[in-house]
Amino acid sequence: YVNDELCGYKVTNGLWMDMAQGIENAFKIYDYNNINKNIPVLIISGSEDPVGNFKRGVISLYNFLRNFFTNINIKIYKDERHEVFSGNKKREVYKSFKSFIETA
């Protein structure tokens, strides 16, 4: 992953702004007051994903969303990074995702 020539490129300031606003909006309580609390939610991340603060941020998001959803699940893949659907455990990730969709 680190040696991939398509990774590690410089991103625009706009991308960072969009990401920051998305993270900020994810933690705004008023956005969750008028939604269906019974919809299934699955949070997927790699344990080595710096975007998810090496799983700590992902766990914080999960704990926050548990206040609003009755059917919330989290799956953190050990030793995977950000793109779990194309990482070393992609078969396991797709299998778990398929199972979640089929039982949701």
Name each model feature, range by range:
Residues 37, 43-45, 49:
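Short beta-strand/loop motif that positions the catalytic acidic residue
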Residues 32-37, 67-68:
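Short, conserved loop/helix-junction motifs that constitute active-site signature segments
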Residues 50-60:
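Conserved alpha/beta-hydrolase "acid-adjacent" motif
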Residues 7, 11-33:
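Active-site nucleophile elbow and catalytic-triad environment of alpha/beta-hydrolase enzymes
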Residues 18-21, 59-60, 92, 96-99:
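Alpha-helical elements of Rossmann-like donor-binding domains used by nucleotide-donor carbohydrate transfer enzymes
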